C-alpha cells in the first residue's frame, strides 16, 4: 500500500512539472473554450490537483476495505502462509457484505486505472512531460490498478472462493464497467484532436479491457499451468494484453512527444512529407499501431482472439451485451490507431514550421520500444499458452474479425476525418462533460463544506467571544451584590442557611421516621 501511495504522489509531482502554467503547449483543451461557464482547458497545476484528488478519493475507501479485511480475517497477506481465507471471510459477511467489501476495495484500482466515471484525471494528466506519460500513464501507474485487481482475483481463486455469490455479483458489475470504459475511451480517442489526449483516451480504453477481461474469471472454468502456477485463462489474457499495451503505448507517447517538438503544436498535424523526414517515428507508429490494434498476425491479434474467446464463452452467464461492447470497442480502437497515424504522417495538415530539434536521441527511445513491441509476436507460442491464444485465433470467425480490422485500419488511413460523427464530436472533444460536471459537483461540495465550517467557526467564536463572557459578566454582577464586605450581613446569610438545613432535616425525620 505504501508503494501504491508512492505512485500517486509521483504522478502528482510529475503531472504538475510545469506548475507555473505559463506555456500553452503544456495545457490540455482549447484555451478560451468554456463548459457550463467554466474553463474547458486544464493547466498543469490544476491537472496535478485533479489527479491526486481523484486517486485519493478511491484510496480512502480502499484503505477502509483493507482495514476491514485485516480485522475480520486477522491477515493482510494475499499469498503465502497466513493468507486471507477468502472463503471463510465471505461466508462470515454474507452476499451483501462481500459485494460491499469488494466494491470499496476496488474503488482504489478503479480511480487509479481511470475507469468510468473516474477517467477524466488521466486525460488532463497529459499536461505532464511526454516521457512521464510514456512511463506512468501507459505502463506503470495506471496499470497498477489493473495489476492489483489481477492479484486480488488470483488470491481469491487460490482460496477457492471465486464462485461465492457476492464475488459473482461484484465481478459482473466490473465486467460491464470495464468494457463500457473501453468503448467510451475508444470513441474519445477517435474524435479528439490533441495527440496526447488521443493516446490517453486509448489508454483508458485498454485499461477498461484489462479490467473487464479479468472480471470474467469467476464465470469461466478454463485455466492454464505456467510452471508451478495455475492461472485462470481470463487473468492470463488480460496480463498479456497489459504487456503489449505498455510497450506499444509507450512507443506512441514518445513519438507524440517528438512530433510536438518538431511541429510546435500539441494537435494533430503532419503529412507524408513529415513522414519522410521522420522515418523512424513513422515506422515506429505503424509498428505500435498494428501490434496494439489486434490486426493479424502480430501478438495483438492472438491476444484479442483470446479476449473474444473468453467473453463469448460466458455470454449466457453475463449477457451478450458484454461481447457486443468488446467487439465495438475493438473496431473503434483500431480506427483510432489508423486515424492517429494518418493525421500525423499521411493525410494531416501540412506542417508550416518544423523546429527540427530532439533528433536522434528521441528517435532511439521509441525505436527500441517499437522493436520490442513487434517482438511480442512470440508470446502466443511461448509460456505454455498456445492453446489459450492460437486455437481461438485460428477460428474462422475470429480470422474474419481480424481481416475486418485490417480493412478498417487501411480505410481510415486513407480517409481519417471524423466529421461523420456529427454533433457527437463535440461531446467527445469535451470528454463527455465529466470534467465540468465533476468541477461543478466538487466545487458545490467544497462551497457547502466551506459554508458549514464557516458556521461552525462563527458558532465557536460566538461561544467564546460573546456567550461565555456575557455569562461571566452576569454572574459577576450577582456575586457583587452578595459580596458587599459587611460581616454582619455574612453572619445573617450563614444563620439563614443553617435554619433552612435544620428545617429540611426535621422534615426528613418526620417523613421517614
Segments from the language model and where they lie:
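Loop-to-transmembrane boundary segments
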Residues: 53, 58, 278, 358-369, ...
